[in-house]
Amino acid sequence: MAVMIWGSGTTNGRGPRYTEAALSDARLPAVLRTTRQAVRSGDLSGAYRQFILNGVRRSFSTKWFAAVDDRDVGCARALILDSRVLHSLNALGWSSWQAAGTRRWPTRYATYVSSMHGWASSLGVTADWLEWLLFHLNGRVDGPREGQDST
């Protein structure tokens, strides 16, 4: 599970335990196979719904989706959705459950991906660059305060 090693960070110490839980889960081969197929067919909601493994949550399952999505760039390719990206989106006033019209995470994830690709297109950037920016900001999206130089 390279995406778990990639995204575990160095501060919380839970990465090895969660990675071991995922690697020990008997469902692992089938989950990786079926979710890869769902992602490659453009069914991101279905992939999200099917990705159930011990020790793996949204941040890592969506990293898997982004890693295996090799569709043409014209498609709304899978993006990573982790807590840092969510902090930034929420700080900007965007709510996945309101945008999706449901609290069901598979639909919310697909709505997030679609929204990000739409915003990226209108801004003239790629969706993965926009995702990186939101990750980097981690919710710190305030502009300059009154009286501060913005340069």
Please give the residue ranges for each predicted region.
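A near-ubiquitous, low-amplitude feature marking generic local secondary-structure context
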Residues: L44-Y48, V68, A99
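Alpha-helix boundary/capping residues
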Residues: T35-V39, V68, L92
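Short, hydrophobic/amphipathic alpha-helical patches that form generic packing surfaces
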Residues: M1-G13, K63-A67, E131-F135
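C-terminal accessory module of base-excision DNA glycosylases/AP lyases that mediates lesion recognition
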Residues: S59-T62, D69-T151
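Helix-hairpin-helix/helix-loop-helix acidic hairpins
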Residues: M1-V56
